[in-house]
């Protein structure tokens, strides 16, 4: 697998892990004991795939979930990608009830591995920081 394909594969694995977490969390967030387990599972996903930026990981604090889910591969396809050495950008289109949004994930290659470093969404021609 090529260097840049590894970046895409890392993002897809992250999205699959997050989708599984979102599905589990919608069923279990009402139970206080399950909240701690969900928080630990989410932290493990972030530790495996993401840099340690606190703003990127705001969901660890809120445990928020949107419906429809944020990371369902069928409804959030990668529509474009850019590569520049040790950085890669993947653009994901979201369609919620006819309202489209474009997200951009920045990946960085550090310590012999690709990491998600930033998520942004396009608003009025400007990229705005978002959290995972």
Language model segments and positions:
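Short, aromatic-enriched amphipathic alpha-helices that serve as compact interaction elements
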Residues: 2-25
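Surface-exposed, charged secondary-structure patches
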Residues: 41-99
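Short hydrophobic/aromatic beta-strand element in the GNAT-like acyltransferase core
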Residues: 11, 89, 104
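Poly-acidic low-complexity segments
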Residues: 2, 26, 70-75, 117
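A structured, charge-rich N-terminal accessory region that forms the first stable segment of a protein
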Residues: 17-56
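Short beta-strand edge/turn micro-motifs at domain boundaries
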Residues: 100-131
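N-proximal accessory regions
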Residues: 2-5, 9, 36-41, 84
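Residue-level signal for alpha-helical context at structural boundaries
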Residues: 29-33, 60, 64, 132
């Amino acid at each position: 697998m090529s260097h840049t394909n590894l970046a895409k594969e890392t993002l897809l694995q992250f999205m699959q892990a997050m989708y599984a977490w979102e599905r589990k969390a919608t069923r279990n967030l009402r139970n206080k004991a399950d909240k701690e387990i969900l928080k630990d599972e989410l932290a493990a996903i972030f530790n495996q795939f993401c840099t340690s930026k606190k703003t990127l990981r705001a969901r660890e604090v809120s445990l928020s979930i949107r419906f429809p889910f944020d990371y369902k591969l069928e409804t959030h396809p990668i529509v474009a990608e850019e590569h520049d050495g040790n950085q890669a950008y993947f653009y994901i289109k979201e369609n919620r009830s006819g309202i489209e949004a474009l997200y951009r994930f920045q990946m960085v290659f550090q310590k012999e591995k690709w990491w998600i470093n930033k998520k942004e969404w396009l608003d009025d021609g400007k990229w705005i920081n978002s959290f995972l």
